[in-house]
Amino acid sequence: MSEKFSLWLRCLHWVNFPALAIMIWSGILIYWAHDVYPGFFPDWFYEKFKIDHRLAQGMAMHFTIGWIFTLNGLLYALYLGVSGHWRELFPTLQNFRDVVPTILHDLKLRREKPRQGKFNAVQKIAYTGALLLGSLGVLSGFAIYKPVQLSGLVRLLGGYQMARGVHFAVMVAFILFFILHVVQVIRSGWNHFRAMVAGFEVEDDDAGS
């Protein structure tokens, strides 16, 4: 067995996973009350999941879990810096060149496995992108929550309506990331999932021979 993820990283991940899910769900409850992009979510979607007329519930959940999501994100950023984990996570120029070969290998269209360390090129870009998305989501969220007190931030984001658009785009991007992440976890098998739970991954005996 080899250590894959530290205890700190696992704890932060398993706090972030449900927090992000609740933030997305409560965000949709809030969005229903002011559908600025009509038709993006069809009526059957609202009816199926009973989303209509739940603005107060959505706001209560969003503002409560939002603080947990933000604090967890700050702790994660601190962990990256203190532990040096950022060196394994942040992509290099070579990683961007390896994106296509990595995807082709993942789809079984390329036999040769691209170079990689703890994370492959696509994982590095996706996880770093998620970190940037989270930061943008928090900033745009504060901008539309306190537009008068944080008028400078609102202007930086292009105005109130633009800040709302950015916040909505972040939510959609996180939904896509969420789906792809779960699919990849399922595809990678139990060994990788166990590593995020227990911290260790079982290696094949042939791997080192």
Model feature map: region roles:
Residues 1-209:
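Membrane-embedded alpha-helical bundles that constitute the cytochrome b-like, heme-associated redox core
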